[in-house]
Amino acid sequence: MSNQRLPLIFSLLFICFFGESFCICDGTVWTKVGWEILPEEVHYWKVKGSPSHCLPYLLDKLCCDFANMDIFQGCLYLIYNLLQAVFFVLFVLSVHYLWKKWKKHQKKLKKQASLEKPGNDLESPLINNIDQTLHRVATTASVIYKIWEHRSHHPSSKKIKHCKLKKKSKEEGARRY
């Protein structure tokens, strides 16, 4: 039960102790300066009043709450710097991506230009591709020819068994008569 009340107590103490220390606009100037200075003596000390006399109460209170908050200013400065860093990183990544994409496009254009332009030399990629295709066709044809020759000279074992069975059945049929 006390563990549930503890955050509530700390938050109330925080509000009580630090609530008034962040605002300098709440009262008259002489209450914030000290009890020794009277309101009549303020113009002798050249102390300026709060700049937000014409604002409505809520805006005046809001301006007073955020007027001297170093934490708030520090957070805004930190957020500003973080946003700058994030936008810088995004800019660098975008430039890198566009650079890579441009280089890839340039390589593709060079490759297309080399394929479209007929090469007189024997080292062009188009001639190498045709040579490779012809070599594959020739090797495939030679392998198929070897298999065909092997099959024609050596009948398969199924054919031999089938032929033997036919001969046996003919011999048995001849013996019956």
From Swiss-Prot:
Residues 155-177 are annotated as: Disordered. InterPro entries: TEX50. It is a single-pass type I membrane protein. The chain crosses the membrane at residues 75-95. It is found in: Membrane. This is Testis-expressed protein 50. Residues 155-168 have a biased composition (Basic residues). GO terms for cellular component: membrane. Residues 1-23 form the signal peptide. It comes from the Eukaryota. Keywords: Membrane, Signal, Transmembrane, Transmembrane helix.
